[in-house]
């Protein structure tokens, strides 16, 4: 499939998701910027979040249930309230931002990876040579069990401690997204970007 047609189809899906408010509101401006480049199109994204997830065992997505999720900071009381609703094991998880971007060619992929690395996304790279998909990701993550079958496994002081760290790590990821946006805006302004 030709790049232009591929990008057009992916943009259609993105715009539909954006109109249905399925795209994290705090990352829309960055995604629009990425999509404004001729040689990039976003495939999926998450601006980072904190969640309480009920799981039978770690990694078991099929039976998982979100008991609470927040894309901005969260209060200890909100996490505790969500965890107490667990029927299995409630995990407090702080997810870092992640964006998948298809690029027209390897040169465009390298340019995007350089901008991502400059912004602090050190764990970014090409994850597929088909459409040169770049994963922009970082390592800010917390994942630990906090309750089981409605009973807290940790005391209030420890829960307060990890929620504070989760909020700080979430903010750090959001700051990186801001730096990525600045790097791409600078690239656009300098007219340094050209397709080969």
UniProtKB/Swiss-Prot annotation:
Sorted UniProt keywords: Methyltransferase, S-adenosyl-L-methionine, Transferase, tRNA processing
Any GO BP: tRNA methylation
A GO term, aspect molecular function: tRNA methyltransferase activity
Top-level taxon of origin: Archaea
EC number: 2.1.1.282
Reaction it catalyzes: 4-demethyl-7-[(3S)-3-amino-3-carboxypropyl]wyosine(37) in tRNA(Phe) + S-adenosyl-L-methionine = 7-[(3S)-3-amino-3-carboxypropyl]wyosine(37) in tRNA(Phe) + S-adenosyl-L-homocysteine + H(+)
Cysteines engaged in disulfide bonds, as pairs: none
PANTHER family: TRNA WYBUTOSINE-SYNTHESIZING PROTEIN 3
Described purpose of this protein according to its UniProt entry: S-adenosyl-L-methionine-dependent methyltransferase that acts as a component of the wyosine derivatives biosynthesis pathway.
Protein family per UniProt: Belongs to the TYW3 family.
Protein name: tRNA(Phe) 7-((3-amino-3-carboxypropyl)-4-demethylwyosine(37)-N(4))-methyltransferase
Species name: Archaeoglobus fulgidus (strain ATCC 49558 / DSM 4304 / JCM 9628 / NBRC 100126 / VC-16)
Gene name of this polypeptide: taw3
């Amino acid at each position: 499939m030709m790049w232009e047609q591929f990008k057009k189809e992916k943009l259609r899906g993105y715009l539909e998701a954006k109109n249905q408010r399925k795209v994290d509101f705090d990352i829309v401006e960055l995604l629009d910027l990425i999509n404004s480049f001729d040689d990039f199109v976003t495939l999926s994204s998450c601006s980072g979040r904190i969640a309480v997830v009920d799981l039978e065992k770690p990694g078991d997505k099929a039976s998982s249930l979100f008991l609470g999720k927040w894309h901005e900071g969260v209060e200890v009381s909100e996490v505790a309230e969500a965890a107490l609703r667990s029927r299995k094991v409630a995990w407090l998880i702080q997810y870092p931002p992640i964006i998948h971007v298809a690029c027209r060619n390897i040169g465009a992929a390298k340019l995007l990876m350089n901008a991502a690395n400059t912004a602090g996304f050190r764990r970014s790279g090409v994850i597929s040579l088909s459409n040169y998909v770049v994963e922009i990701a970082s390592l800010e993550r917390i994942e630990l069990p906090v309750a089981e079958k409605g009973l807290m496994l940790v005391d209030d002081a420890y829960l307060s401690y990890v929620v504070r760290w989760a909020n700080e790590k979430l903010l750090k990821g959001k700051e990186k997204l801001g730096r990525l946006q600045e790097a791409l805006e600078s690239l656009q302004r300098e007219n340094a970007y050209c397709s080969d």
